[in-house]
C-alpha cells in the first residue's frame, strides 16, 4: 500500500512537470503570432537598431515577443508592475493594508485589484506601442501598413488579451504545475534568447571582432557569475528565537530554540529591473518620439550603457530600491509583535520595540551587502557589453532571474518530494497501528 502511495505521488509530480512544460510551449508559440497590420520586414530592422536600452531589456524579458511585435509583446510585465504597485500602496494606504490581513478572502480581493490594474496598465502601454509604431518609418517603408483608429483599437485589444492570457497561464502553472508560473514564463523567455546570444558571440570571434581568448574568458566568467549568484542567493543570517517553557500538570513543555532565517538579498531581482527602467526611459522616449532636441540627445548619450554617469546612477538606484523593497517585504515591527504574541523572544533583546530595532539593525547590514552584490552582478556585464558588444540577454539582470527561478523551482520540487515521502510514511504508521 505504501509503495502504491509513493508511486501515485511520483506520477503526480511527473504530471505537474509535464503540464508546466506544455504551458510554457504554448507561451513560446504565442510569441511568434504577430499583431495585425504590421510590416514584418520594416519591424525587424527597427528591432535590430534597438537591441540596447529598455526596449532590449523588455524584449529579453518577453522572449523576443516585443521585437517581433507578437500578441505577447507586453509579456507579463504589466501584471508584475501592477502587483508591485499594489504592494507599495498597501504600505501607504491603510484600508488596503487591512484588506491583506483578512486571510484568504482579503487575498482574493487584493489579487482582483491587481488584475484590474493590470488591464489598465496594459491598455495604456498597448496604446503607447500603437502610437509609437505608427510614427516609425524605415528605409523599406512604414512599420504600420494602414495607420489609424482601427489599427490602434485592434492593437490595444490584442496586446491586453495577450497579457491577460499570459497571466492566466502563469496562474495555471502555479496551481496545477510546478514552480511559480509568472517567474517561469519570464525564465523561458530569457532562455530562448541565449542560443542566439552565444551564436552572436562566436560569430564576432570568428570575424576577429572578438578575441578567442576573450570569448573563452566570457564563458568562464559566466560560470563564476552563476556560482556567485547561487552563493549569495542562498546566504542567510539565522537569528536565534527562544520559546518559553510551559508546565502542564507534572510535565514541562516548550522551551525549545529555533532559528529565523533572514536572506542576504531580501529584495530579490526587483531593484535592478526598476533601476534599469528609470535610467533607460529617456533613451526610449527619444527613440519612440524621434526627438532631435539637444537636451534629449545629451540625456541619451550620458545615460547610455557603460557610461560613467549611467553606472553611478545605476548603482545608486539599485541600493535605494534594495532598502525600499526590503522594508516592504520584511516588516520588522509586525514580526516583533508576532513573536511577542506567541511568547517567543530573541535572547538578550526585550520583546517589542527593542526586538524591532534589532531586526532593523540586522536588515540594514544585510541590505548593504545585498545591494553591493546586486550592483556588482549588474554592473560588470554592463561594462563587458559596452566594451565587447555582447548581447543584452547575457546581462546581470537576466542571470539573476534565471538562477533565482531555477533555485526556487528546484526547492519546490524537493519540498514536494519530501512531503510526499512524509505522507507515505505517516500512512504506513497508520496502517500498522
From Swiss-Prot:
Organism: Rickettsia conorii (strain ATCC VR-613 / Malish 7)
Subunit note: Component of the Sec protein translocase complex. Heterotrimer consisting of SecY, SecE and SecG subunits. The heterotrimers can form oligomers, although 1 heterotrimer is thought to be able to translocate proteins. Interacts with the ribosome. Interacts with SecDF, and other proteins may be involved. Interacts with SecA.
Family designation: Belongs to the SecY/SEC61-alpha family.
Function text: The central subunit of the protein translocation channel SecYEG. Consists of two halves formed by TMs 1-5 and 6-10. These two domains form a lateral gate at the front which open onto the bilayer between TMs 2 and 7, and are clamped together by SecE at the back. The channel is closed by both a pore ring composed of hydrophobic SecY resides and a short helix (helix 2A) on the extracellular side of the membrane which forms a plug. The plug probably moves laterally to allow the channel to open. The ring and the pore may move independently.
Protein encoded by which gene: secY
Pfam families referenced in this protein's UniProt entry, alphabetically: SecY
Localization annotation: Cell inner membrane
UniProt KW DNA-binding keyword: no
InterPro entries associated with the record: SecY (IPR026593), SecY/SEC61-alpha (IPR002208), SecY_CS (IPR030659), SecY_dom_sf (IPR023201)
Superkingdom of this protein's organism: Bacteria
Primary location recorded for the protein, binned into one broad class: membrane
UniProt protein name: Protein translocase subunit SecY
Single Gene Ontology BP annotation: protein targeting
Gene3D superfamilies with a match to the protein in the record: SecY subunit domain (1.10.3370.10)
GO CC terms: plasma membrane
Membrane disposition: Multi-pass membrane protein
Transmembrane regions listed in the UniProt entry: 17-37, 71-91, 117-137, 141-161, 184-204, 212-232, 268-288, 310-330, 366-386, 388-408
Keywords associated with the record: Cell inner membrane, Cell membrane, Membrane, Protein transport, Translocation, Transmembrane, Transmembrane helix, Transport
Amino acid at each position: 500500500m505504501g509503495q502504491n502511495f509513493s508511486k501515485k505521488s511520483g506520477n503526480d509530480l511527473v504530471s505537474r512537470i509535464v503540464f508546466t512544460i506544455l504551458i510554457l510551449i504554448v507561451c513560446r508559440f504565442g510569441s511568434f503570432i504577430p499583431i495585425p497590420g504590421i510590416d514584418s520586414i520594416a519591424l525587424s530592422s527597427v528591432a535590430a537598431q534597438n537591441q540596447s536600452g529598455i526596449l532590449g531589456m523588455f524584449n529579453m524579458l518577453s522572449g523576443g515577443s516585443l521585437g517581433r511585435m507578437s500578441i505577447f509583446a507586453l509579456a507579463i510585465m504589466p501584471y508584475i508592475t501592477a502587483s508591485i504597485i499594489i504592494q507599495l500602496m498597501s504600505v501607504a494606504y491603510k484600508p488596503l493594508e487591512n484588506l491583506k490581513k483578512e486571510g484568504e478572502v482579503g487575498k482574493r480581493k487584493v489579487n482582483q485589484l491587481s488584475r484590474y490594474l493590470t488591464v489598465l496598465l496594459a491598455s495604456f502601454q498597448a496604446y503607447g506601442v500603437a502610437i509609437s509604431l505608427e510614427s516609425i518609418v524605415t528605409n523599406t517603408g512604414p512599420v504600420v501598413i494602414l495607420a489609424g483608429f482601427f489599427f490602434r483599437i485592434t492593437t490595444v485589444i490584442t496586446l491586453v488579451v495577450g497579457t491577460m492570457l499570459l497571466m492566466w497561464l502563469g496562474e495555471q502553472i502555479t496551481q496545477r504545475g510546478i514552480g511559480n508560473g509568472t517567474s517561469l514564463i519570464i525564465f523561458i523567455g530569457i532562455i530562448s534568447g541565449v542560443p542566439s546570444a552565444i551564436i552572436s558571440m562566436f560569430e564576432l570571434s570568428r570575424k576577429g571582432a572578438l578575441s578567442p581568448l576573450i570569448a573563452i574568458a566570457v564563458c568562464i566568467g559566466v560560470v563564476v557569475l552563476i556560482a556567485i549568484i547561487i552563493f549569495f542567493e542562498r546566504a542567510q543570517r539565522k537569528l536565534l528565537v527562544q520559546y518559553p517553557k510551559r508546565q502542564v500538570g507534572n510535565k514541562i513543555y516548550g522551551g525549545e530554540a529555533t532559528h529565523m532565517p533572514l536572506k542576504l538579498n531580501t529584495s530579490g531581482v526587483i531593484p535592478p529591473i526598476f533601476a534599469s527602467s528609470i535610467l533607460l526611459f529617456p533613451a526610449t522616449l527619444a527613440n519612440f518620439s524621434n526627438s532631435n532636441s539637444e537636451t534629449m540627445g545629451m540625456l541619451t548619450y550620458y545615460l547610455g550603457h557603460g557610461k560613467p554617469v549611467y553606472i553611478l546612477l545605476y548603482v545608486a538606484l539599485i541600493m535605494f530600491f534594495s532598502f525600499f523593497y526590503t522594508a516592504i517585504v520584511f516588516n520588522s515591527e509586525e514580526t516583533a509583535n508576532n513573536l511577542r504574541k506567541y511568547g517567543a523572544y530573541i535572547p538578550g533583546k526585550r520583546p517589542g520595540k527593542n526586538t524591532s530595532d534589532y531586526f532593523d539593525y540586522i536588515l540594514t547590514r544585510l541590505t548593504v551587502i545585498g545591494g553591493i552584490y546586486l550592483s556588482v552582478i549588474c554592473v560588470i556585464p554592463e561594462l563587458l557589453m559596452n566594451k565587447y558588444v555582447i548581447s543584452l540577454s547575457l546581462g546581470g539582470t537576466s542571470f539573476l532571474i534565471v538562477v533565482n527561478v531555477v533555485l526556487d523551482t528546484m526547492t519546490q520540487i524537493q519540498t514536494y518530494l519530501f512531503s510526499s515521502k512524509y505522507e507515505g510514511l505517516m500512512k504506513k504508521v497508520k496502517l500498522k497501528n
